[in-house]
Structures are given as C-alpha cells and as structure tokens.
Design a protein with these regions (language model features):
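Surface-exposed amphipathic alpha-helices with a cationic face
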Residues: 48, 141-151, 200
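Short acidic active-site motifs
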Residues: 117-120, 139-143, 163-166, 194-195
Length: 206
C-alpha cells in the first residue's frame, strides 16, 4: 500500500512584529523566517515521519529547490512534483508579540493543476493505495472521480472550507480529516458530539 498526497506546496514568509500592521501603516519587522509549508507538504512530511511510504504530487515554480530538498529530508518521494512557469504558492504571515497572526495566501502554482497532470500521477497508483487531499489546489472534483474509479481509497481534509465542497461527491470519501471548525461548517452543528453524529449520518461509509 502506498500513500499519495496531492496537494499544496507553499513557502511561508513569517514576519515577527510588535503588532499586526494597520491599513496605511508601514512598520519594521524584527525577524523574518522562511519555511516550507502548505497542507499538502505538511501532510506528506507527517506521514513520512510516521514511517509510511509516501509520494507527493504538487506544482512549484523555479524556486523549487528548498521545497524539494526539505521534503526529501523528511523521506517524502517527490518524483511527481513538477515545475510550472509561475511563482510557487506562498503565505505572508504576520505574528505579533502576543502570538496573534494575520495571513495572506497566494495560490501561485497550486492553482495550475490540469486533468493531464492528474492522470499522469494517478496512472502510477492502483486499488489498495491511499490518496490524501485538501482544498488548497484546483480540480479536486476531477481528482475525486478519477481516483475513485481506480479503486483508490480517498482521505479528504476539507480545508479551507468552501460551500462548494458540499456539492462534491463526498460519498466517495473513505475518511475525513476535520477539526471542530470544519466539522461545524460541514454539518451546521456546533457541539463536537453532534458534529460527529451528523458526519456519520451524512457519510455512513466514511
């Protein structure tokens, strides 16, 4: 059994500030950190650290080297990662002295997935393998249908949540990764037990 993560690859630019910048304000940053992230990258790295054989599929720009080197250091197989003529997705993160943050996301290459690229990746996987998805790339509905047709088990983290997710063929999902916020958005319930009960009612096969 192989694990395939099809997802976002981001560079996180983290600025340490006295306070979150206000409209029209210019302030100096005390520190800048750059890290590899994106839900796809993070999930692949976590699986690899847990000892799984995991493949990562995603799109990056010409500044790909740090991303690939870091993923490979975790033990992630990056053979399916491809370069595109755009900037790698990134996040600008402001963190104030109290730990509060503000985040601006740029999708970049994460929004350049095509049906041809999806096919080229899924052709290397088969029934019994596991696909892990999030909602930071485009074309998720197409990926769901094609993976399901191949007999691949599908795990979905519906984050960031959008109402359109509820129109996807979610009965094809084998397992949901959700937190309390996403669960509430999926079910319109607020209490954890009610969220779980409603998820089981809506998706009894997951």
């Amino acid at each position: 059994m192989s694990f395939l993560v099809m997802g976002s690859l981001n560079y996180d630019y983290i600025y340490s500030l006295d306070h979150i910048v206000a409209p029209g304000e210019t302030i100096a940053s005390a520190k800048l950190d750059k890290a590899c992230g994106g839900k796809g990258f993070n999930q692949a790295a976590a699986l690899a650290k847990a000892g799984a054989k995991v493949y990562l599929a995603g799109l990056v720009g010409a500044d790909k080297d740090q991303m690939l080197e870091t993923a490979q250091e975790f033990g992630v197989d990056c053979r399916f990662v491809q370069e595109r003529d755009n900037a790698t997705g990134h996040a600008i993160i402001q963190v104030d002295k109290n730990g509060q943050n503000s985040i601006v996301l740029f999708g970049g290459t994460n929004r350049m997935w095509t049906a041809e690229y999806v096919d080229s990746v899924l052709d290397s996987f088969e029934k019994g393998d596991v696909l892990i998805l999030q909602n930071e790339i485009n074309g998720i509905e197409d990926i769901l249908e094609k993976a399901y047709a191949r007999g691949i088990s599908i795990v979905l983290n519906p984050s960031p949540f959008e109402d359109c997710i509820l129109s996807w063929q979610l009965e094809k999902i084998s397992l949901f990764f959700i937190n309390e916020v996403e669960g509430s958005q999926m079910t319109q319930k607020s209490e954890p037990k009610d969220i779980l009960d409603q998820m089981l009612f809506q998706y009894p096969d997951a």
